[in-house]
């Protein structure tokens, strides 16, 4: 993973986990995590991630990522490595090219999808546990769309 990509993933993770109102606060959080960056670099990263400052009802502003930005960024780069997504009432199974499952599972985990409780990856298969009952089919369809893969029994993805 490139330094730029890693830094952007950390920035996205920080923005999802904390209420950060200024680039200086974000730079301090990055430095605390051992990542050095300039304000100009951080500004470009925020623009690339689609982050924007929004007003809070209780006053002040915070940086916020658009819905789905992280998942599209991280998962879209893995298109072509997934051969099929299937589900039953309680589990989603993703079949990948040999050796690809760990990277795809990590991208799913980092995407912070609210419908995903967690993942377990082998060499070419990922088990995805939905966060709630009756969400497996919906989650399978969403992951298949993000990964450019067919859902079992529905034909190729568009």
Swiss-Prot record:
The keyword Chloroplast does not apply. It is found in: Cytoplasm. Keywords: Amino-acid biosynthesis, Arginine biosynthesis, Cytoplasm, DNA-binding, Repressor, Transcription, Transcription regulation. GO terms for cellular component: cytoplasm. One of its GO terms (molecular function) is DNA binding. InterPro entries: Arg_repress, Arg_repress_C, Arg_repress_C_sf, Arg_repress_DNA-bd, WH-like_DNA-bd_sf, WH_DNA-bd_sf. One of its GO terms (biological process) is L-arginine biosynthetic process. SUPFAM superfamilies: C-terminal domain of arginine repressor (SSF55252), Winged helix' DNA-binding domain (SSF46785). Pathway: Amino-acid biosynthesis; L-arginine biosynthesis [regulation]. Belongs to the ArgR family. Regulates arginine biosynthesis genes. This is Arginine repressor. It comes from Anaeromyxobacter sp. (strain Fw109-5).
């Amino acid at each position: 993973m490139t330094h730029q990509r890693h830094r952007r993933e950390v920035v996205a993770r920080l923005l999802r986990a904390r209420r950060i109102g200024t680039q200086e606060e974000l730079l301090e959080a990055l430095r605390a995590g051992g990542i050095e960056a300039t304000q100009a670099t951080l500004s470009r990263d925020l623009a690339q991630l689609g982050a924007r400052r929004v007003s809070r009802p209780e006053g002040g502003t915070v940086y916020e990522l658009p819905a789905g930005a992280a998942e599209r960024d991280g998962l879209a780069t893995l298109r072509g490595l997934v051969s099929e997504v299937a589900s039953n009432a309680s589990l989603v199974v993703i079949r990948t090219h040999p050796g690809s499952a760990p990277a795809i599972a990590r991208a799913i985990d980092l995407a912070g999808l609210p419908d995903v409780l967690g993942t377990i990856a082998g060499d070419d298969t990922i088990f995805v546990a939905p966060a709630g009952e009756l969400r497996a089919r919906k989650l399978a369809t969403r992951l298949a769309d993000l990964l450019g893969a067919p859902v079992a029994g529905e034909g190729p993805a568009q």
